Amino acid sequence: MTSYLLKNITVLDKTSEHNGKKVNVLIENGKIAKIGTAVEDAAAETIDFSGSYLAPGFCDLYVNINDPGFEYREDITSVANAAIAGGFTTICATADNHPITQSKAQVEYILNNAKNTPVSILPIGAVTENFDGKTPTEMLDMHYAGAIAFSDVPHSVKDSGVLLRALQYVQPFDGLIITMPFDKTLVGDGQVNESEVSVRMGMKGITNLSEYSMVQRDIELLKYTGGKLHFVGISTSESIDLIRKAKAEKLNVTCSVFVHHLVSDENEVKNFDSNYKVFPPLRTKDDQQALIEGLKDGTVDCVSTQHTPLNIDEKNVEFEVADFGIIGLETAFGLLHKKLENEISKEKLMELLSANPRKIINQTASTADFIILNFDEEWMLPEKNIKSKSRNSPYLNTPLKGKVKA
């Protein structure tokens, strides 16, 4: 296999003794073999990476792989190609497949079919059978088969007793429960954020209360049970305040926000572009700023894409009947860096995309989990270059800053 000598590349990894240094890196068989200022190899193909950075690959805690059951939207091969194009070397696959990932056999199906892909695809098992919110799954069996965590996303666990028992059940094997907090009875038929924008559009709104009321409930359950709880898709300022307080009380709680909530707000839906129809909905600018402040002070642990492939019949229809969802693996880095380059450091962005999500699921990056980044490159992603099978993104052909080079 060809060896490569990457010259004059800057290391961006807080765990490395070379962090912040310009080095040469020898790559053999796809792994880092040597790294240092004096590394040379006459037999290797030499590439000058002046101005670029060597960093651990990104990790996404919320990806819909759609395999098995919805392969017309995405499959394991296509999602792996989309992930690696966006710099993600590890992705966590939600249980929202058909059949739902709720047994040892279904966990093994994903792991076996992902073996020959360029990324690590880690299955998340369901908390309740068929997402019914009532009947617990065999979480222990799935854990031993390789499930990385347990979640009913895109649903919330509506029954408090079920979530309480799940938090207790997974503690002996240090399991993680992931939840997307929302009260379905308060969401109803809502389409967009409840505000002046929803009124002007004539659309039913989704209140902040529908989210933060469940955050409050889940935190109280965590106080009672102990264990570990991760909130995905936090979108409101009130939720951020509650999680900040819970962390101050030393509860074992973490949270992530979605890329689109950081880079877009509710004003994007005014023109009824269904590609901006996501759940939770895009919120106000004040909510968005609260999320950014949460990134800065550590309330928000990481950023996820909520990669949700949908085909044209599910998305390019009237706004009210369009499905919720957006693809995001390939544009995440360019969107985030463009939006946040004056708000957070490069090191902080790497924590949010790489170190922290791995810490939440007790994973570490291997010597093969590296990517090469150029923070200054401006580019756009045309539809013809998308690796995903689906095209449901409002960020195609829009200016991005920061590109994954390899």
Predicted features along the sequence, with ranges:
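N-terminal metal-binding scaffold of metallo-dependent hydrolase/deaminase domains
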Residues: 1-41
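C-terminal cap of metal-dependent C-N hydrolases
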Residues: 9, 318, 367-406
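Divalent metal-coordination and catalytic microenvironments
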Residues: 9, 30, 51, 62, ...
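Active-site metal-binding motif and surrounding structural segment of the metallo-beta-lactamase
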Residues: 38-54
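Metal-associated gating/positioning segment near the N- to mid-region
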Residues: 50-114
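A glycine-rich helix N-cap at a beta->alpha junction
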Residues: 113-126
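Histidine/acidic residue-rich metal-binding segments in metalloenzymes
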Residues: 137-303
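His/Asp/Glu-enriched, well-ordered alpha-helical/loop segment
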Residues: 200-226, 296-297, 302-304, 308-373
